[in-house]
UniProtKB/Swiss-Prot annotation:
Keywords: Calcium, Metal-binding, Muscle protein, Repeat
Functional note: In muscle, parvalbumin is thought to be involved in relaxation after contraction. It binds two calcium ions.
Keyword Repeat: yes
Record-annotated EF-hand domain positions: 38-73, 77-108
Binding, Ca(2+) 2: D90, D92, D94, K96, E101
Organism: Amphiuma means (Salamander)
Keyword Methyltransferase listed: no
Binding-site residues for Ca(2+) 1, renumbered to this chain: D51, D53, S55, Y57, E59, E62
Family: Belongs to the parvalbumin family.
Cellular component terms (Gene Ontology): cytoplasm
PANTHER family given in the database record: PARVALBUMIN ALPHA, PARVALBUMIN, THYMIC
Record InterPro entries: EF-hand-dom_pair, EF_Hand_1_Ca_BS, EF_hand_dom, Parvalbumin
Listed name of the protein: Parvalbumin beta
Length: 108
């Protein structure tokens, strides 16, 4: 579970910072939830949780539900938020985020 890696308190703080529509900022979220400071292996574990279909990539539909991985009652990201998140993370332009791209995004 994601709470094995990140504290429930930090997750709650991160989620409350993005409650409002169109308020999602991945840099702020990764910092507030504590993921930005985690070692590579723990970031990889979070990637594996986000990669719901185990394809080795986080695709757009998985990104849209990103917040729900942290708390099932969290909102879905809007189309604009999802596209901006994907654009920020997809450095090779293949339309999805691989594990190395995710590591770079978390640390950006």
């Amino acid at each position: 579970a994601i709470t094995d890696i990140l504290s429930a308190k930090d997750i709650e703080a991160a989620l409350s910072s993005v409650k409002a529509a169109e308020s999602f900022n991945y840099k702020t979220f990764f910092t507030k939830c504590g993921l930005a400071g985690k070692p590579t292996d723990q970031v990889k574990k979070v990637f594996d949780i986000l990669d719901q279909d185990k394809s080795g990539y986080i695709e757009e539909d998985e990104l849209q539900l990103f917040l729900k991985n942290f708390c099932s009652s969290a909102r879905s990201l809007s189309n604009a938020e999802t596209k901006a998140f994907l654009f920020a993370g997809d450095s090779d332009g293949d339309g999805k985020i691989g594990v190395d791209e995710f590591q770079a995004l978390v640390r950006s």
